[in-house]
UniProtKB/Swiss-Prot annotation:
Any Gene Ontology CC annotation: fungal biofilm matrix
The species this protein was found in: Candida glabrata (strain ATCC 2001 / BCRC 20586 / JCM 3761 / NBRC 0622 / NRRL Y-65 / CBS 138)
Subcellular localization(s) per the UniProt record: Cytoplasm
One of the GO BP terms on file: translation
rRNA-binding is among the record's keywords: no
Family: Belongs to the universal ribosomal protein uL3 family.
The name this protein goes by in its record: Large ribosomal subunit protein uL3
One term of GO molecular function: structural constituent of ribosome
Domain of life: Eukaryota
Coiled-coil segments: none
Main location: cytoplasm
Entry keywords, A to Z: Cytoplasm, Ribonucleoprotein, Ribosomal protein
Short name of one Pfam family: Ribosomal_L3
């Protein structure tokens, strides 16, 4: 019930202003984990597509908790992660004003998937992107090797250019997502050699992350358009008899200063914001060619991660996937950037070994009661539509 109070704390967080639409649909990695040269060269993040959510059952291994050694039910998110393709390498040098790009070296051959990213209208274009650049490889590649040597000599940070294989997903989109991912581990020379060796080759998600690892999810949240101040900021509704509306802010400021302060709650855009959600535990990294990638030691049913009828508003996941605990930003089909954690998490939740007992694969459209088509056929018998 709407009512009035004489004092109240402010509504809404001012730390995420401005609440406007994100400039790009892809999550940007603004900070990478600290480099450790003693470790082998590896990527620090990965790109995937949010497929949907499901439910798992596991035994909690947390001494001291009331639920220790008891079954718990948790919600998990499935991210479709087909292998990414390495198509370039970028070298950065340290300057007094931060990192500055030294040079960029591209691979000889680029697929049409990533070339579409450089065109606004692919069908009306002449499709000549990178034709002059690829000719450098035909001339013994001397200039390419010279640029790689410059990176080895001057660069302090090495990042690779990778793009997704969107054709392997159920998405209608044909344009791949292109991103820079930092290489950590080894020396600068080893990083450049690793990037050169992986030109035009794929990198799978299991070479970047491992089970029980804590990772971050970076994405653009689900958009809700123009919203009123009550829903957007959570302000109190005014009393019932208020003139000209209840879902408003009664006083938006004093006479002077003669303008509305930036901190006053106002109506506007809600959702489609760039957000980073940290500390999601990986419960499973599944292989796309494994027909039993949703089976466990307690549930030996041969089934895939796809629920009956596929994930709602996404479809079938036929590639490698990452199952993380909880929900992550973004809607179905949205590209999600998965990044290694920026610090070593030593909490009990982080170091706990997770063993799944059961993964729900019932239909997510309605009240699904069958886990597999075979189970449905055994219970229902031959249906009229199957004749």
């Amino acid at each position: 019930m709407s009512h009035r109070k004489y004092e109240a704390p402010r509504h809404g967080h001012l730390g995420f202003l401005p609440r406007k639409r994100a400039a790009s649909v892809r999550g940007r990695v603004k900070s990478f984990p600290k480099d450790d040269k003693s470790k082998p060269v590896a990527l620090t993040s990965f790109l995937g597509y949010k497929a949907g959510m499901t439910t798992i059952v596991r035994d909690l291994d947390r001494p001291g908790s009331k639920f220790h050694k008891r079954e718990i039910v948790e919600a998990v998110t499935v991210v479709d992660t087909p292998p990414v393709v390495v198509v370039g390498v970028v070298g950065y040098v340290e300057t007094p004003r931060g990192l500055r790009s030294l040079t960029t070296v591209w691979a000889e051959h680029l697929s049409d998937e990533v070339k579409r990213r450089f065109y606004k209208n692919w069908y009306k274009s002449k499709k000549k992107a990178f034709t002059k650049y690829s000719a450098k490889y035909a001339q013994n590649g001397a200039e390419i090797e010279r640029e790689l040597a410059r990176i080895k000599k001057y660069a302090t940070v090495v990042r690779v250019l990778v793009h997704t294989q969107v054709r392997k997903t159920p998405l209608v989109q044909k344009k791949a997502h292109l991103a820079e991912i930092q290489l950590n581990g080894g020396s600068i020379s080893e990083k450049v050699d690793w990037a050169r060796e992986h030109f035009e080759k794929t990198v799978s998600v299991d070479s970047v992350f491992e089970q029980n690892e804590m990772i971050d999810a970076i994405a653009v949240t689900k958009g809700h358009g123009f919203e009123g101040v009550t829903h957007r900021w959570g302000t109190k509704k005014l009393p019932r008899k208020t003139h000209r509306g209840l879902r408003k802010v009664a006083c938006i400021g004093a006479w002077h200063p003669a303008h509305v302060m930036w901190s006053v709650a106002r109506a506007g855009q809600r959702g489609y914001h760039h957000r980073t959600s940290i500390n999601h535990k990986i419960y499973r990294i599944g292989k796309g060619d494994d027909e039993g990638n949703a089976a466990t030691n307690f549930d030996r049913t041969k089934k895939t991660i796809n629920p009956m009828g596929g994930f709602v508003h996404y479809g079938m996941v036929n590639n490698d996937f990452v199952m993380v605990k909880g929900s992550i930003p973004g809607c179905k089909k949205r590209v999600v950037t998965l990044r290694k954690s920026l610090y070593t998490n030593t909490s009990r939740k982080a170091v706990e070994e997770v063993t799944l007992k059961w993964i729900d694969t019932a239909s997510k459209f309605g009240k699904g009661r069958f886990q597999t088509p075979a189970e449905k056929h055994a219970f229902m018998g031959t249906l009229k539509k199957d004749l």
